[in-house]
Amino acid sequence: MSARCFRGNTELAGLDPANRGLAYGDGVFETMRVHGGELPLWPRHLVRLREGARRLAIPLPDDAVLQSHAEAVAAGCEAGVLKLLLTRGSGGRGYSAASATEAEWMLALHPLPAAASDALQLVWCDTPLPVQPLLAGIKHCNRLEQVLARMEVDRAGADEGLVCDADGQVVSATAANLLVLRGGRWLTPPLERCGVAGVLRGWLLEAGLVTVEPLSRDAVLAADALALCNAVRGILPVGRLGDRNWPPHPSFDELKARLSMAYPMFSRPEAAA
């Protein structure tokens, strides 16, 4: 892993130990696919980053500065993952951010995970996502529910897990959005109360390939096919959820083909990582 840290436009040797992102999760982040030294989904990630910074009232560095440094870190990397972490900086008394310093941010380049060889094996997670409309949709740094849910997935030896809100409505996987095929239509749960609005989910909605609709556990289990999507993996088929199995479905191939036409990086084998 290689990383670079900044305060505003000034490069730092590292993040301050008093950084509010480390202390309180006071920040937002983006996890981006690198392909051929470029960041094909950068414009979409920047939109979500801006929205997260706006909601948390964190001053965002200049777009051109962010992009130039991100592109510099990604350059020369054929296939990888770039994480951009933006925090409020350091300072303030306790939770108060009144005297916080200028925003601090970090870029870290990671290898692309190994490709998955089979359809994903999923479990239901018992850890619920809390309802908080003020934070719903953005990728803020407080991810403890996802950490706990992922521990359940690891204990079960599964690839991923589905999480629900406190009312039992299905929200997403721990690190991906959920796609459910019913009656010839691909559906995805609403995210106005909790969850992360993935940039790839956003593209699918804008392209008219997916529709937002509330989904219960029973509705998910009654689906004709399931898939997960995120900006690093692309779209992946689900083969099993608990005791329910799904064979390959032609609608999944059609959906993935549409995505690959728009973003060829997701047609490559490592897109299944």
Regions found by a protein language model. Give the residues of each.
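Helix-start/capping segments and mature chain N-termini
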Residues: M1-A72, G76, T87, G92-A273
